[in-house]
Amino acid sequence: MMNRKRAFWASTALFTGMIVAGAASAQSTGSSATEVEEVVVTGSRGPATAGVAIAETVAKTRNTINQEFISTQAAGQTILQTLNLTPGLSFTNADPYGNSGGNIRLRGFDGSRVSLTFDGIPLNDTGNYSSYTNQQLDPELIERASVNTGSTDVDSPTASATGGTINYQTLRPTADMGGWLQGSLGDFNYRRVMGLFNTGEIGPWGTTAWLAASYTDYDKFKGIGELEKTQYNAKIYQPLGDNGDFIALSGPYNENRNNNNQGPNLATTTGFCGAPGTATATTPCLDQVKTSPFGWDVDFDRTYVAPTVRAGVADIDTNSANYWGLRINPSDTGNVRGNSRFTLMDGLVLTVDPSFQYTLADGGSQQAVLAENSQLLRGTKATGGVDLNGDGDLLDSVRVMTPSVTNTHRYGLNSSLIWDINDTNRLRVAYALDYGRHRQTGQYGKIDFSNPTDPKFVDPFGGRNEEDNRIVNLDGYVLQARDRKSIAELNQFSVEYRGKFLQDALTVSLGVRAPFFKRELNQYCYSQNSSSNVLCTSQLPNAALANGNVTFGAATTQYIPPYARELKYDDILPNLGATYRFGEGQSIYGSYSESLSAPRTDSLYTVRRNPTTNVIDNPTVQPETSKNYDLGYRFTTSTVVLQASVFANEFDNRIVSTYDPELDTFVDRNVGSVKSTGAELSAGWEPIENLSLYGTASFLDSELQDNYVLNAAGAVAATKGKKQVETPEEMYSARISYKFNEVFAAGIQAKYTGERWVTDVNDQKVDAYTVVDLDARFDFATLGLDGTYLQFNVTNLLDEQYYSTIGTRTTGTPGQPGYSSPAFAGVGAPRTVMATLRYSF
């Protein structure tokens, strides 16, 4: 007979060992303080956990991992890769150590439709909702991480998540002073050092804090280039009395300086470049890994032909934009997060989580060849230009940097007022603010040709930082590739009731959230009518046309002058759930939730001049919406943790880039619905002491409900009835870990990812693959060195060759509607070996 009792906690109160369940995995302090759940405790073993599997109690499908498992994985690895062992999540890593980023798919939803949160604050970009997995917290500082595969919390401050939530939380400082230092070495010249120092309790009020820093540098696993990452972190925690109240303040600063990877092109479905009857109909177009002399190591160009610099001669840089040294992805990110809980009176609790985030990043191809006498450089002048290469003439075409810089200042607040009506009924009201100032610029910058065969950008952010690095035209105007400012403001109100019935066997949660989302768009350049192209110039336009558009010089292309627009979106979204406990350690649960994703910034900057009213507008893109249904069963004993669920999702108003016949261009628009059903299973078992087994299975059947129009001729992509791209229908994972003695422990794990469609019409796919990883640790505690160990990790043990990320297309068949060029894909990292030595004090 199991010995059962209730344990109540808030997520901010950390426990020893592997206590991670229910509210401990909630996103915000408010959700943590609200999700008071039952934990099964079984004698001396503590809360139910079996290896990777951790008992959950919430009325939604959630899978959680903790630091004990995270620490067995490769040092410095992105937390998304570590979570990839859980069901429902497909994460494809772009390199063996995680600093190049990767791609998220969760029950078929891409990363921009999945909310990624850090101590409850949203991390998805405010403009296009992208998740940058290479900028996440050092894994050694993460206490726990969880995946809600279907629904968000009722107070989740998101205007983008239609496909679930990924959340992680930081370590709490310890009461005792101490810390550790560690160093890692690995393949591809991998070098990483990290340290953490806990102050212990300081001052008269039991204040605790920790400081941490890390530095990582390694070579790309293919091609030429390196990846460098520096991160600093700190946290301070102040308990307020002995009732769970506290104030905490924490923050990271992360700096990435990476060379990009280039994925190989894939074969066409016919194996030839052209459609039947065309000149290229018999030209082979096979997978580039088969035709390139570099094979699976195909990447950006390794050489650069030195451009000539000759006075009186028209020198032209004929190199492509694919030289490795000019393909970079720099970013500076940081945030400050506050978490707090205050008991106002018996049964009344207030939680307040404020935050500020900063982002400075650059991406894209970032370069162009600019003629020295171009109109951009002449500006309002009829003749002349700028001598860019210093050879004394204005005849040349010189490569310059054209960055796509994004600078975001983001302010957030997530607060809850929680009222315990009595022992079995609880009411919460919550308010969330997410305000982002999104500045997107592209000030041209210079390229350093001091070594003409190995050029480098003078500054990774172009002309943003230094005046001397800018390209200035004859009018004194700094050339720009883009210039716009966007404000994204979310005000959200939510209410939740939680009640226990039938002698606490039944827990019911009834919630609703009301997001009010506003986008302010300020375009400072001229927008090409019915296009996303812009012209940033000091050149004076011709007199305005009757419709308000303008032209330049003798050209007939119409542009819309700089403008400002405002768009608003709102909705009422229910979030319901129930859990029923019965028997010994058994329960069933069900949930229903609705979500929305407002149109992204880039969708809204494609504008036209309405031919009837002459006002500036664009096709009315409505928010995407989803309805998620979950039903699950859980079984927990002292040695077994099992969770099984079935689900259905209705995804409506799906936004894709399609042809609009009125605009005669491609724009983002709502094209229909996706219906998905599936099942997920996870199980952990500890058959004997020190042996842990874990396994998962995920099944997904998703179907597009509509076709969509491709071009002015009315060609249609036959997508109705097809499956979603990049989404495996089957995934399996397993892990075995065993502690042989007090000195040595090891684990081996594998993840199988099924076939994935490359094209919307499902005429091309990539093969399934299996990646096996190994970890082994030698612990030196028996030598009196508690917390000191040597760990080895081998990723992709069997050296599987596979495609990771995919550049999808409408079709892979030349001559078919929607075909443009061969698709491409990222290459999975080969076998990689690394070692980490940690010394604790």
Q: Where do the PLM segments sit?
A:
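Extracytoplasmic beta-strand/coil segments of soluble accessory domains associated
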Residues: 72, 78-122, 150
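N-terminal periplasmic "start-of-domain" segments of outer-membrane beta-barrel proteins
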Residues: 37-74, 103, 145-147
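Gram-negative outer-membrane beta-barrel transporters
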Residues: 503, 641, 645-651, 667-760, ...
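Acidic/polar loop-and-plug regions of large Gram-negative outer-membrane beta-barrel proteins
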Residues: 237-239, 244-337, 362-406, 452-486, ...
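A beta-strand signature from Gram-negative outer-membrane beta-barrel systems
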Residues: 37, 136-182
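Membrane-embedded beta-barrel scaffold of Gram-negative outer-membrane proteins
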Residues: 351-353, 501, 581, 587-589, ...
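Short strand-turn segments of transmembrane beta-barrel domains in outer membranes
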Residues: 164-201, 211-223, 749
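C-terminal beta-signal and adjacent terminal beta-strands/loops
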Residues: 596, 743, 751, 755, ...
